[in-house]
Amino acid sequence: MRVLIVNTSDRSGGAAVAANRLMMALNNNGVKAKMLVRDKLSDSLTVVALPQSPLLHWHFLWERFVIYCRLLFSRRHLFEIDLANAGSDITSLPEFKEADVIHLHWINQGMLSLGSIRKILRSGKPVVWTMHDISPATALCHVTLGCRRFTSGCHHCRLLPGGGSDNDLSTSIWHKKERMLDGENIFYVACSRWLEGEAKASALLQGQKITSIPNPIDTHIYHRGNRQEARRRLGLPLDRQYILFASQRVTNENKGMGYLIEACRLLHDLTNATVLILGGHAEEVTPQLSLQAIPLGYVNDERRIVDIYQAADVFVLPSLSENLPNTIMEAMACGLPCVGFRVGGIPEEIDHKRNGYVAEYRSADDLARGIRWVLTTTHYQSLSDDCVRKVSQSYSQQSVAIRYIDVYQQAMAFKHYKL
């Protein structure tokens, strides 16, 4: 079986990391998988970049320009909206032609347009689409933050000036997506059971096949190690307790840094605690923390990232909206108990008081309570052991690959039946 995974990048962002890991998992389990991307950042032989052309950058710029105009020349929400009004036609590429299954992932920001996707659907090849966020089930957004209009049809979009209208941009894109899907079948795979439920509630995806499979992780790379040795390699003091926060961009409001800042204020009595901030713009938030803090910046070296997980005592991700965060999975694979809000797929990863703490949504008080509980519990080793056990049982490469192979076989059988 030949599978072509399609994603905007092979390295940048959580979806890219997850798609890359899935490709490796499939190749390790008898599938011939390749990955097609616009932005190739690795030297992997199984990752293929789109043919270089000025159009690639133009697709991205044109989409952003149109959004900028529709936002009345405001940069606010500029990267929270996707129109899919520009993108590449991949159906003539040899990698596409030789594939038995086309597996879409995060294909936004000028990678594929709605027209490109429609052409893929009309090619006759079975299509699987992994949902890394709610975008395939809504008109414009990647994060709904409580909005339920996608259950009946998008309009009055909160991201548009004045809150949109009855017949706004979201309504227009919604109808275009309806036309794209008309008479076509896609096998949708959400990365969490929570997102599966959201997708099934979408009026856009009624009649489509939707299931959930978690992202895989390579436990040969992400594994438990000697904490003191990891701290030595990082040049960290050995006698501190480390609270780790990680995000590609730590100032992203959706990642909840404001709640961690407030939680640290409530934990000011933990004089032996230090916050490690992993991600871009880390130095901007360090002065706002009541506890000692060390900005680690953006780290691309996977070995160093593993050292950081192994060096920490607790991982905190107070996101306001999440699917199934790779960072929690990575931390748990390294035996690191996690604390996060009860939102999205986070409660599926963290089993409350078994391998971490699930705090009440948007409660800095409960977030602080969870951090304190992990740092002071007499059962810390048991928490750590359960983290490793949970990842091994639920997120191993083999278990995830087997489930995806089953979906591919269903998609191929359904397509042949329809023909």
What do the predicted segments below correspond to?
Residues 138-143, 164-212, 217-227:
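A short, active-site helix/loop in glycosyltransferases that binds the activated sugar's phosphate group
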Residues 237-255, 261-264:
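Conserved donor-binding/catalytic core segment of Leloir-type glycosyltransferases
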Residues 279-306, 314:
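Nucleotide-activated donor-binding/catalytic signature segment of Leloir-type glycosyltransferases, i.e.
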Residues 306, 325, 329-333, 347-348, ...:
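Short alpha-helical segment that forms part of, or immediately flanks, the ligand-binding pocket
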Residues 320:
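Aromatic "clamp/platform" in nucleotide-sugar-dependent glycosyltransferases that forms part
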Residues 337-340, 350:
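Short hydrophobic beta-strand element within catalytic cores of glycosyltransferases
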Residues 352-353, 357-364, 373-378:
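Conserved acidic donor-binding segment of nucleotide-sugar-dependent glycosyltransferases
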Residues 379-394, 403-406:
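A short, well-ordered alpha-helix in the C-terminal region of glycosyltransferases
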